[in-house]
Amino acid sequence: MADLAKLVDDLSSLTVLEAAELAKMLEEKWGVSAAAAVAVAAGPAAGGAAAPAAEEQTEFTVVLAAAGDKKIEVIKEVRAITGLGLKEAKDLVEGAPKPVKEGVSKDDAAKLKAQLEKAGAKVELK
């Protein structure tokens, strides 16, 4: 039990950037995605009553296709949307095409797409 208490104390002392990096490292180590886990957990709550609506796509992935000419503005928007640090956001933008946000609703995906396109990026919804 003392090990668990120490672990809780250590995790509580992490900064937001360190916590985001830890989450990314755990996702890579375990081969999972935190966004997918949230989507799976939210899925059963809808129940079987939504079966007719299942034909229409309800979850979207916002994919940064290209940064365009205003790369700095796009990096700022990616940071605002994802909460990533400067280096991580820069790597994501320079590594396009890459997903920015996964498992988002149609409305949220449209808003994020508009935000990124306003900054100068080319964006796809999948």
Swiss-Prot record:
Pfam families per the UniProt record, alphabetical: Ribosomal_L12, Ribosomal_L12_N
Keywords: Ribonucleoprotein, Ribosomal protein
Keyword Isomerase carried by entry: no
Biological processes, Gene Ontology terms: translation
Ribosomal protein recorded as keyword: yes
Gene Ontology CC entries for this record: cytosolic large ribosomal subunit
UniProt GO MF annotations: mRNA binding; structural constituent of ribosome
Matching Gene3D superfamilies: 3.30.1390.10, Single helix bin
UniProt xrefs under SUPFAM superfamilies: ClpS-like, Ribosomal protein L7/12, oligomerisation (N-terminal) domain
Stated role: Forms part of the ribosomal stalk which helps the ribosome interact with GTP-bound translation factors. Is thus essential for accurate translation.
Record note on quaternary structure: Homodimer. Part of the ribosomal stalk of the 50S ribosomal subunit. Forms a multimeric L10(L12)X complex, where L10 forms an elongated spine to which 2 to 4 L12 dimers bind in a sequential fashion. Binds GTP-bound translation factors.
Family according to the record: Belongs to the bacterial ribosomal protein bL12 family.
The protein, known as: Large ribosomal subunit protein bL12
